[in-house]
Amino acid sequence: MNFQSKFLTRSQSLKSLLCVGLDPDYCKLPEIIKRSPEPLVHFCREIIDATAPYAVAYKPNIAFFEVFGSSGIRQFEKVIGHLKNNYPQIPIVADIKRGDLDNTARQYARYYFGDLQVDSLTLSPYMGLDTLRPFLEYQDHLVFWLCLTSSPDSIQFQKKRFSETGRTLYEEVAYVANSISPLNLGFVVGATNTYELEILRKQNPDRIFLIPGFGAQGAKLDDLLPVCGRYSLINSSRGIHFASDGLDFAARANQEAEKIHNAMQARFVFL
C-alpha cells in the first residue's frame, strides 16, 4: 500500500489528522528512562504504544538520534522497526530535512526508502529539483518538501518576493513542485501560518500537507481545521510526549493524544 492510501485509510478510520512527533530530547526524558541501556528506544516505544489508538502517522526526528552517533542510529532503526512490526497500518514520516545533489540524494533515498522502508520523509528544496528526483523514483513513498515553516525566522527567506514573478520564496517552491506535479510530493506548511496555509490549500487541494507547529509552538486547532483541508497531517510532538516527566509520562501522552483526537473528531467535517 502506498503512502497516500495508507494515510487516507488511517485518517478516515480514526476521523482524525493527528501526526504524533517523536522528538526524544535526552535532557527532557524521565529519569527512569535515562537509566535504560537504550533510552531513546525505550521512550519512543512507550510513547508509540500509548498513543497508537489515536495516531494517523508518526514522525520521528532523526536529529535526536544522530546526536548519539552510531548508537543513536541503531536506536532510530529499532524505533522504525517497532512501528513497522507492530503498527504496519500507521505511516511513518522520517523527519530528516535532507537536501543535496543527485548522487548524494540517491544514497539518502536508498537508505530511508530502500533499506528502512519508511513511508515518507522531509526534504529541503534549497538546492533545487536535483535533491528531489531520486526520492520520487520510489513511487509508493511520499516526499514532504519544506515550503513554509513555523520557525519565527522563516520570514527572513521564505516570505521574500522574487521581483521577476512577484511570488514569495515559499510560493515559488509550490509553483516548481506543481510544474512537475507528482502526487507523491507534499508540502511542509507551518501551523502558525494560517493565512498562507489557506492560500496554499486552495491552490493545492489534493496535495498532502504536513503541518508542524501545533501545540507547544502555539497554533490552535480552531484556527487550523477550517483552512487545512482533508489531506493534512497536523503534528504534535512535545505537547504529547513531554506532557509529563514523571513515571506517568506514557499515560499522560495517551491522554493528550486522546484529547487532540476527540477535538479533531468534533470540529472537522469529514467527506
UniProtKB/Swiss-Prot annotation:
Lineage: Bacteria, Pseudomonadati, Spirochaetota, Spirochaetia, Leptospirales
Pfam family, one: OMPdecase
GO MF entries: orotidine-5'-phosphate decarboxylase activity
UniProt EC number: 4.1.1.23
Protein name in the entry: Orotidine 5'-phosphate decarboxylase
Pathway(s) it belongs to: Pyrimidine metabolism; UMP biosynthesis via de novo pathway; UMP from orotate: step 2/2
Gene (name only): pyrF
A single GO BP: 'de novo' pyrimidine nucleobase biosynthetic process
Active site location: K97 (proton donor)
Keywords in alphabetical order: Decarboxylase, Lyase, Pyrimidine biosynthesis
